[in-house]
Amino acid sequence: MSLIKKKNKDIRIIPLGGVGEIAKNMYIVEVDDEMFMLDAGLMFPEDEMLGIDIVIPDISYVLENKDKLKGIFLTHGHEHAIGAVSYVLEQLDAPVYGSKLTIALIKENMKARNIDKKVRYYTVNNDSIMRFKNVNISFFNTTHSIPDSLGVCIHTSYGAIVYTGEFKFDQSLHGHYAPDIKRMAEIGEEGVFVLISDSTEAEKPGYNTPENVIEHHMYDAFAKVRGRLIVSCYASNFIRIQQVLNIASKLNRKVSFLGRSLESSFNIARKMGYFDIPKDLLIPITEVDNYPKNEVIIIATGMQGEPVEALSQMAQHKHKIMNIEEGDSVFLAITASANMEVIIANTLNELVRAGAHIIPNNKKIHASSHGCMEELKMMINIMKPEYFIPVQGEFKMQIAHAKLAAEAGVAPEKIFLVEKGDVINYNGKDMILNEKVNSGNILIDGIGIGDVGNIVLRDRHLLAEDGIFIAVVTLDPKNRRIAAGPEIQSRGFVYVRESEDLLREAEEKVREIVEAGLQEKRIEWSEIKQNMRDQISKLLFESTKRRPMIIPVISEI
């Protein structure tokens, strides 16, 4: 596709998520008076986000300009690309563009959240062209761990703005996983103005091991297992799940799934023909014990840390459905993120202690779903962009990707390292980063959207680490006396029976503070409560070196 004939004036590129982090992808591209959203993903909470279910990007800037939004363009069906779509559509109206599988998964998300809203869905593929007033938009097939992944190409009068989505190059894959390198080369020859590209594995040298080689080595490893085999992987890694199904069929083992997160997406993809499953291969998890141990494979799946958590429970004999037994073999088909490394190491120790054999996870038997250094350079060389923006990674990964782009020939001054909310402006002459819009995290707790802030998280940390200390007093303000109490209650702070002296001392301190407040000309309840918080906190810290949350409760008769 050649450049559009209309001369564009202004272009703005704004990351609202997916930079400085591996998740929550969302990038805004504005061409004159039209706005396009590239991916709308979520992030699963970090350890310190106590009680938070998911995190989505702050879209206040989009809401302020919602009349300009022409569509949400999705690269693939993983949660960090589509997980925020239903939350976005609750707040505005916009058509949604994606591959057949991606659109099906979005519809399922909307149904699961009981959002009954008429949405315009457009199924697109490698040959689709969407025409707008200022731009045309086309797509190209990429390889990721889920079928029908796409890159997005916004054609402007200056050249194409290409968003790769999450990708790798693997020419051993075919069908729904095959990359269309010919189409990419055509886009590169037509002229790429800006390349926005995946940085997740920008620090990993070389190439990923081809998936056909991975499957061969997995077969060799699994064939040596004499007992029950448990494979732990993410529910979203359809390539790995298909490989396990293939190997199980060759080894005459039945397969059972353990984990609720897989059910809906797997069943949707299965009905649409994305999985090749031999007849009678799958059995319910409740029937596993009906087969000899050397005739079954259990695939423990889930999102984020769920598969590892399930293994930990199984190792400790705390799982509701099944537990690790002597002679079991376990394979973790998971690429550990930084915050998961310690958890995985601890879980492996628990599994070994429970009698399991661990099949080593190495480059021969496991590959990332993101391109390594040489694959990233290959994309840059194919596209030959004038400007380059590394995204989808921690900041150090973005920096590593920027260095690769410079090595591949992109002028260093035309490489932009961006953070959430940064605005890259192009006015027809210069590309500059000189502006910022509102951005950040929206924390979702249950059905509450954005009503959990830093203060609430701080309080949850306090409760989790140091517990809670409640002082209850009933007052007779008319006669200026304590009618009942003080009564002290604590949870998660100290073992009451071993700390009776400390609690009695705290009661006396509360009595002293309240009686002093009752002697004032004007009784100030807020001041009495604050004095209780300050002085009790000081007393408890001096005795225990801990600071529980202090809650004074004062009632009147």
Swiss-Prot record:
It is an enzyme of class 3 (hydrolase). Zn(2+) binds at H76, H78, H144, E166. Its main location: cytoplasm. Its cofactor is Zn(2+). Disruption phenotype: Very sensitive to temperature and medium changes; slow growth at 37 degrees Celsius on Mueller-Hinton medium, poor growth at 30 degrees Celsius. No growth on other media at 37 degrees Celsius unless supplemented with MgCl(2), nor at 42 or 25 degrees Celsius. Double rnj1-rnj2 mutant grows much slower than either single mutant and only at 37 degrees Celsius. Substrate binds at H366, A367, S368, S369, H370. Keywords: Cytoplasm, Endonuclease, Exonuclease, Hydrolase, Metal-binding, mRNA processing, Nuclease, RNA-binding, rRNA processing, Zinc. One of its GO terms (cellular component) is cytoplasm. GO terms for molecular function: 5'-3' RNA exonuclease activity; RNA binding; RNA endonuclease activity; zinc ion binding. InterPro entries: Metallo-B-lactamas, RibonucZ/Hydroxyglut_hydro, RMMBL, RNase_J, RNase_J_2, RNase_J_b_CASP, RNase_J_bac, RNase_J_C. Its EC number is 3.1.-.-. GO terms for biological process: mRNA processing; rRNA processing. It comes from the Bacteria. Binds up to 2 Zn(2+) ions per subunit. It is not clear if Zn(2+) or Mg(2+) is physiologically important. It is found in: Cytoplasm. An RNase that has 5'-3' exonuclease and endonuclease activity, with the exonuclease activity probably being most important in vivo. Involved in maturation of 16S rRNA, rnpB (the RNA component of RNase P) maturation and degradation, and mRNA maturation and/or decay. This subunit probably plays a structural rather than enzymatic role as mutation of its putative active site gives no phenotype, and its deletion is partially complemented by inactive RNase J1. Homodimer. Component of a possible RNA degradosome complex composed of cshA, eno, pfkA, pnp, rnjA, rnjB, rnpA and rny. Interacts specifically with RNase J1. PANTHER family: RIBONUCLEASE J (PTHR43694), RIBONUCLEASE J 2 (PTHR43694:SF4). Belongs to the metallo-beta-lactamase superfamily. RNA-metabolizing metallo-beta-lactamase-like family. Bacterial RNase J subfamily. This is Ribonuclease J 2. It comes from Staphylococcus aureus (strain NCTC 8325 / PS 47).
